[in-house]
Amino acid sequence: MNQPPSLSPAAAEDLRPVVFVVDDEPMLLELNAVILEPLGLRVRTFRDPDTAVRAFQLANPRPALIVTDYAMHTMNGMDLISACRRLQPQQKIIMVSGTVDETIFRNSPERPDFFLAKPYQSKQLTEMVRSLLEL
């Protein structure tokens, strides 16, 4: 009986959904990667939102999800959302912030799919990710 060919570990790795995490705080980048990787996701972290936007422009396929901070040095999270959604209008995005609340996004056409106030529990983030990516 013929069995389907098995994927090499590298090929299986490539099939996992990619998540971009964007935050100018290195410790939070690391923490979010530790939280998200066990969900079977490939996590790419970016300290600089401009670099994240350039990576998004070149990504094929696009990331399944972006988790971004709001307040960053060179670009805020809303500008990052706008830049990414110009290329991928249905891009799934979670915004995190310790400086603003979600009321500022309610009437924005660029509002994120979910908002998470800092500090947050890892369970809150994983539940949002599972919901958006249907994991």
Where in this protein do the model-derived segments appear?
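Two-component/phosphorelay signaling modules centered on CheY-like receiver
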Residues: 26-44, 132
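Non-catalytic signal-transmission and effector/linker regions of two-component phosphorelay proteins
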Residues: 1-20, 30-33, 54-57, 61-62, ...
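Receiver (REC) domain active-site loop signature in two-component systems and cognate sites
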Residues: 72
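Hydrophobic/aromatic residues positioned on beta-strands within the core alpha/beta folds
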Residues: 95-96
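Acidic, metal-coordinating helix/loop segments flanking the phosphotransfer/catalytic sites
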Residues: 45-65, 105
